[in-house]
């Protein structure tokens, strides 16, 4: 039992450590590096924890102390951080633990830290909850670790902790780690993105490694930053029509689409549909449990198998046929590609493979979803990373319209003025699309849009797309007719 204890030293660089096993009785050890010391007591959580006592005589070392949100107040913090002798200081929350540079904690948070701990704790708690960890009697006997580092990239994630650089004179800590800076605009995104790397594995495969983790980043903007700030302003989700117009209508397979669509549609749109709209708030916890029991692919991160398996798993877990939404994003367009993302991968999906996958879902005879989620988003009234207003009106497809079950106006119509299409009474549409020669050539998210970049002739038509799957597209403009 005692072999499971360890004494570790963590250097100010935050990326190196040494471990020293402890036995019952007197232990005499020689520390090989300078740093902070931690006693780690690893137990089997299926058995009652046996209390132990570890006494550490302070020889040549110095007591640094640590802040524990369950025991200390901001008044304690002010005293502790003011006297801390070491270059790093520990902050222990209920679900999180940060080891940050003392210099910048004194500079940017000298009087209080509880708001920061609340933000970190609630972020980790939200991620654990969406994965269904709260369903277990003792889901975790540990905390999510973050460390500020003296050099390296802006932010990064390892298997053990997330790192936040101070190479920019502490600006990352000030603006994207510590409150109030981290709660302004979309700045909590960075922490969510990096911690998301630690949790993305069940629904990740190569080519998605810098995308699927953004599900967690957007999740905590929605559930933490917006809730604490009392508004809906924090979001880094873009309207899908941008990518449908730029990439999808040109025939690119989903793999080749850049930006938001990689995570916005593949993962986050199902959070909006099931959780934000209240259709099935248990969808993601059940899905993650399914993924823990049966991974998407036999070989971790294998692309060809996981890509189609994700589509089938979403449909099977929800007992809903989302095929039409996946088709809009070219999920089934054949591809034969070799790439590298944290390792080489090969992605080959033939038309036969895609057809067989869709047939397996069709055979289940699941109902279609209530709403068209391919256009569902949370872009709305938003700000960017530094608080600058991006636009002042909600675009078509914003989630609140779905929540209201808003229906197309019977008087929705459109006219063309030069290259501009102007829609009237179209605020309840999920989106608009243009077809030429019977093929969709553009999707649009607002009631006034430019069609000069798409093919246009006498066969061109403009349709309003209803939110409801049960309602057909409505023709609102036909080329050659007034």
Name these PLM-found stretches.
Residues 77-79, 87-300, 310:
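Catalytic cores of extracellular degradative/oxidative enzymes
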Residues 306-442, 458-464, 480:
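Beta/coil-rich, acidic/histidine-enriched accessory regions frequently appended to metallopeptidases
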Residues 3-67, 410-482:
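Beta-strand-enriched, solvent-exposed domains that form extended recognition/catalytic surfaces
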Residues 55-90, 482:
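Low-complexity, Pro/Ser/Thr- and charge-rich linker/hinge segments at domain boundaries
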């Amino acid at each position: 039992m005692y072999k499971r204890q360890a004494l570790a030293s963590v250097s100010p660089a935050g990326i190196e450590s040494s471990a020293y096993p402890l036995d019952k009785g007197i232990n005499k050890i020689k520390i090989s590096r300078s740093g902070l010391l931690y006693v780690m007591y690893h137990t089997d959580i299926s058995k009652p924890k046996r209390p132990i006592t570890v006494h550490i005589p302070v020889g040549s070392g110095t007591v640094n102390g640590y802040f524990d949100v369950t025991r200390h107040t901001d008044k304690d913090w002010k005293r502790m951080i003011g006297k801390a002798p070491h270059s790093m200081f520990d902050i222990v929350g209920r679900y999180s633990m940060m080891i940050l540079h003392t210099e910048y904690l004194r500079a940017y948070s000298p009087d209080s830290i509880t708001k920061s701990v609340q933000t970190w704790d609630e972020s980790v708690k939200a991620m654990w909850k969406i994965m269904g960890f709260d369903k277990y009697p003792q889901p975790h006997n540990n905390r999510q670790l973050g460390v500020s580092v003296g050099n390296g990239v802006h932010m990064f994630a390892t298997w053990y902790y997330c790192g936040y650089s101070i190479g920019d004179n502490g600006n990352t800590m000030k603006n994207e780690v510590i409150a109030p800076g981290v709660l302004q605009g979309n700045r909590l995104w960075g922490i969510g993105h990096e911690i998301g790397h630690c949790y993305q594995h069940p629904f990740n495969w190569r080519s998605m490694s810098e995308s699927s983790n953004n599900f967690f980043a957007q999740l905590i903007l929605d559930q933490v930053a917006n809730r604490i700030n009392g508004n809906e302003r924090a979001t880094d989700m873009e309207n899908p029509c941008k990518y449908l117009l730029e990439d999808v209508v040109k025939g690119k397979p989903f793999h080749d689409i850049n930006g938001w669509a990689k995570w916005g549609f593949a993962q986050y749109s199902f959070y909006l549909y099931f959780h934000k709209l209240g259709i099935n708030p248990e969808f993601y916890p059940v899905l993650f449990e399914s993924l823990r029991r049966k991974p998407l692919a036999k070989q971790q991160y294998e692309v060809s198998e996981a890509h189609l398996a994700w589509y089938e798993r979403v449909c099977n877990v929800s007992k809903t046929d989302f095929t039409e939404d996946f088709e809009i994003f070219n999920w089934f367009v054949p591809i034969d590609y070799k790439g590298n993302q944290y390792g080489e991968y090969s992605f080959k999906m033939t038309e036969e493979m895609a057809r067989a996958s869709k047939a397996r879902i069709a055979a289940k005879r699941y109902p279609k979803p209530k709403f068209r989620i391919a256009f569902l988003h949370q872009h709305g009234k938003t700000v960017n990373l530094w608080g600058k207003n991006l636009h002042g009106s909600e675009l078509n497809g914003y989630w609140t319209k779905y929540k209201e079950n808003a229906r197309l106006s019977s008087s929705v119509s459109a006219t063309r003025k030069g290259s501009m299409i102007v829609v009237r009474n179209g605020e309840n549409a999920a989106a608009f699309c243009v077809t030429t020669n019977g093929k969709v050539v553009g999707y649009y998210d607002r009631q006034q849009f430019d069609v000069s970049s798409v093919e246009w002739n006498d066969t061109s038509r403009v349709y309003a797309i209803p939110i409801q799957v049960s309602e057909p597209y409505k023709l609102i403009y036909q080329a050659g007719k007034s």
